[in-house]
Design a protein with these regions (language model features):
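C-terminal accessory helical subdomains adjacent to catalytic cores in phosphodiester-
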Residues: 1-9, 20-42, 51-160
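Short, surface-exposed binding/anchoring microloops in extracellular/periplasmic proteins
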Residues: 12
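Helix N-cap/beta->alpha junction signal
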Residues: 15-16
Length: 160
């Protein structure tokens, strides 16, 4: 299902299938009336491919579509520089509408701690809806704090 490009909407570009399942779990919790305002895109196949697709397939569209928001959902692979490496590639004109989120190591570690990917995604969405951060406080997710604050400000009103 594609989004209505004339209304504020959110695309999620997942690195791998585990991240796609997290995003799907999140999407299942989005308010029914807002379901078409979010779309989980096909798996990119690695964080570098997420960055490549962002640059080649999404930057121009985001420049033309002011209602578009994009979540780059990547594994941080315990790399403190991963966020900055991606953020430096985001053009300043669209930076407030691009969000970089992910598990600090890999989603598999989060799955062992919290359950299925869709269950985790669902819990993260419920936190956003209820303006709490219970699931987001997990040690493998808490590095997302700054992006989560921005996400709650810009994306939460679109989906919840």
């Amino acid at each position: 299902m594609s989004v209505n490009r004339d209304r504020p909407h959110v695309l999620v570009l997942p690195e791998d299938d585990a991240n796609r399942q997290l995003a799907t779990g999140f999407h299942l919790e989005v308010d029914f009336a807002s379901q078409r305002q979010m779309q989980v895109l096909p798996v990119a196949g690695g964080w570098m491919e997420v960055l490549n697709r962002f640059m080649t397939e999404h930057v121009d569209n985001m420049m033309r579509l002011p209602n578009r928001h994009l979540v780059l959902l990547v594994d941080f692979d315990n790399r403190p520089d991963r966020f900055d490496r991606i953020r430096t590639e985001v053009p300043p004109e669209i930076s407030e509408r691009v969000f970089i989120l992910g598990v600090w190591s890999e989603p598999e570690a989060l799955k062992q701690a919290l359950g299925s990917y869709e269950t985790i995604g669902s819990a993260l969405a419920k936190d956003c809806r209820e303006k709490i951060d219970k699931a987001w406080r997990h040690e493998l997710l808490r590095h997302n704090r700054g992006e989560l604050d921005r996400l709650n400000q810009h994306v939460r009103p679109i989906l919840f």
